[in-house]
């Protein structure tokens, strides 16, 4: 079992005039300039697992948090489940964010490889409110068959009810479920949490998202 590791990521503010189109392509120059959060961990991996790599980058402006995922995946497994469907049963990338670390509440955004979004608010431990939604958040997915899929999130601060400032620190978990035919599911995340069985919702083990201009 792997120990917890509270990582941190410096989230840079977009330069004035720079825009990001949410199309899942990640082809704006800014995505190349931003550094990644670093390697994702495989705390529950077993011999023979594929351990397909994941890259994530983030930035922000006055109104939104932007997240780009590049997920290597030789075989996409996902269904069209619609909005707020059971996307955790698919190839999916996720972000959990806690803008107010003094409480036990956070927000979840899960996007499967078909572009279906599940958003919710939650209270630790696993008290989910699926009635909550983020109508101003936008997402998109783009698939390169046999190689990878990419996902983009544009998360609305207005919907979260909190606007970060330079130096603000939020808790964050980045994670992924990867399913491949004939194999067991693989679960990877940015900050391991010490649990013996896969579980992404361990709020005290979330990393830190640090907003900088």
What name fits each language-model region?
Residues 1-213:
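Structural preference for beta-rich elements and adjacent junctions enriched in aromatics
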């Amino acid at each position: 079992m792997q120990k917890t590791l509270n990582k941190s990521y410096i989230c840079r503010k977009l330069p004035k005039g720079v825009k990001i189109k949410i199309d899942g392509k990640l082809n704006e120059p800014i995505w190349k300039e931003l550094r990644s959060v670093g390697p994702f961990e495989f705390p529950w991996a077993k011999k023979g697992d594929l351990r397909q790599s994941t890259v994530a980058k983030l930035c922000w402006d006055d109104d939104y948090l932007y997240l780009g995922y590049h997920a290597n995946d030789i075989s996409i497994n996902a269904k069209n489940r619609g909005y707020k469907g059971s996307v955790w049963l698919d190839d999916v990338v996720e972000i959990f964010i806690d803008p107010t670390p003094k409480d036990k509440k956070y927000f979840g955004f899960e996007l499967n490889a078909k572009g279906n979004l599940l958003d919710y608010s939650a209270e630790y431990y696993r008290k989910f409110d699926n009635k909550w939604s983020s109508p101003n958040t936008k997402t998109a997915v783009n698939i390169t068959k046999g190689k990878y899929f990419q996902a983009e999130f544009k998360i609305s601060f207005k919907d979260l009810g909190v606007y970060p400032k330079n130096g603000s620190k939020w808790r964050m978990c980045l994670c992924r479920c990867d399913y491949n035919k004939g194999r067991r599911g693989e679960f990877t995340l940015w900050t391991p949490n010490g649990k013996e069985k896969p579980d992404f919702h361990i709020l005290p083990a979330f990393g830190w998202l640090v907003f900088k201009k």
